[in-house]
């Protein structure tokens, strides 16, 4: 998992509440268990005018010109500004995979679905919650100012706007530690590899009958 310390990125405002995981990455693209390759089909039903299917050449598909991520001013966006209850629906881990693969590092919204919230942090995304009034103001600024960028400092837990306004956000200390160190569940386990091996050796010595092969 990539480390997250500080990120400055272009903001894409997605003005839609209750965006569910099926809208983030439709079910027909869930056959793969790899973490990469989902970016081209992120928000597939909103980005394209035709129906998508696995293996399709997305370069030949007609784009929806009204969708925010297809508009030239938001190309290269890495901060997604969203509305309440983002990530609701089924608990597919492919949703944060698709967002990360597309290039997003930060998502800001008034609220997130619990399971999506947990999955996103475990896959290197920083999710930030602000109250509705603050999010409304960020939407207004991002839509009014082309090239609107936010500076996100995880260590200080601050978001700085182009005008210099500093917004402070809360983050669970353990999740913050994992992002700063780039540790997912596997990485956390491997940090204790020596202790695990030591336990296994002592366990085998103390209870050898558990390890005898039948025959």
Curated annotation (Swiss-Prot):
Entries under Gene3D superfamilies matching the protein: Aconitase, domain 4
Amino-acid biosynthesis among keywords: yes
A single GO BP: L-leucine biosynthetic process
Enzyme Commission designation: 4.2.1.33
GO CC annotation: 3-isopropylmalate dehydratase complex
Catalytic activity: (2R,3S)-3-isopropylmalate = (2S)-2-isopropylmalate
CDD domains xrefs: IPMI_Swivel
Pathway(s) served: Amino-acid biosynthesis; L-leucine biosynthesis; L-leucine from 3-methyl-2-oxobutanoate: step 2/4
UniProtKB keywords: Amino-acid biosynthesis, Branched-chain amino acid biosynthesis, Leucine biosynthesis, Lyase
An example Gene Ontology molecular-function term: 3-isopropylmalate dehydratase activity
Cystine crosslinks: none
InterPro entries: 3-IsopropMal_deHydase_ssu (IPR004431), Aconitase/3IPM_dehydase_swvl (IPR015928), AconitaseA/IPMdHydase_ssu_swvl (IPR000573), IPMI_Swivel (IPR033940), LeuD (IPR050075)
Primary role: Catalyzes the isomerization between 2-isopropylmalate and 3-isopropylmalate, via the formation of 2-isopropylmaleate.
Family: Belongs to the LeuD family. LeuD type 1 subfamily.
Protein name as catalogued: 3-isopropylmalate dehydratase small subunit
Organism: Chromohalobacter salexigens (strain ATCC BAA-138 / DSM 3043 / CIP 106854 / NCIMB 13768 / 1H11)
